[in-house]
Structure formats: C-alpha cells, structure tokens
Amino acid sequence: MAKPEFSARGVRIERWPRSLTRAGEVRIEDGRLALLTSYGREIDSAPVKAVRAGRSWFAGPDAAVATVNGTRYRLTMEPARSGGFLEALRRAADDVDQD
C-alpha cells in the first residue's frame, strides 16, 4: 500500500447540523479523498477532482469546509494541518491532471 499524500487523525467531521465523529481521519491517497470514522469506517469518499474545499469566512483557522459528493463537511483539525490539507488536495488534483 502506498503512503498517503495526506493523513490527519483526531479530526472532527461535521455534516451540518450534526457531528459525525470527533476523532476521525482525513486521508488523501491514490487520487481520492476519504473521510473516515475513528474506527476506520468510511463516511464518504470521492476522487480529488470532484472535491471542492476551502476555508469558510465563519470557520476558525483550524477548520476547512469540503464538499464531497454534494455533501458539505466541516473538518476541524490543528491549524497547521488544516492548511496542509488544502495544499495536499490541490497537489493531488494537479497530479491527476498530469497523469
């Protein structure tokens, strides 16, 4: 198994208005974004080209908003990891374009 391009654990994953997990995992691997529960069960996944992500004006520096398969998720993680997630998602999408 290849090493993921990005992986963050302990992520709070919310689908408005409820929290799905407080200790989930966000993983970018093989051109796909996967949102996982703390037990490793998949919440949602999609090819990185189909994912929209960014920072919302109302979210703090530790949060990102991602739209996966038409569903908006709020991902709260350490501030440095949040920026790293957005950058890794952009890089992965660029890598898919080059292949």
Predicted regions and their residues:
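A short, compositionally biased micro-patch
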Residues: 28-29, 38, 68
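Short aromatic-glycine motifs in intrinsically disordered, low-complexity regions
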Residues: 32-42
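Acidic, Ser/Thr- and proline-rich intrinsically disordered linker/docking segments
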Residues: 3, 34, 45-99
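Short amphipathic alpha-helical segments, especially helix-boundary/capping motifs
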Residues: 6-9, 39-40, 63-64
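Short histidine-centered beta-strand/loop micro-motifs
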Residues: 17-19, 37, 56
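Short, mixed charged/polar active-site loops
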Residues: 21-23, 41-45, 72
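Anionic N-terminal interaction surfaces
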Residues: 1-27, 83-94
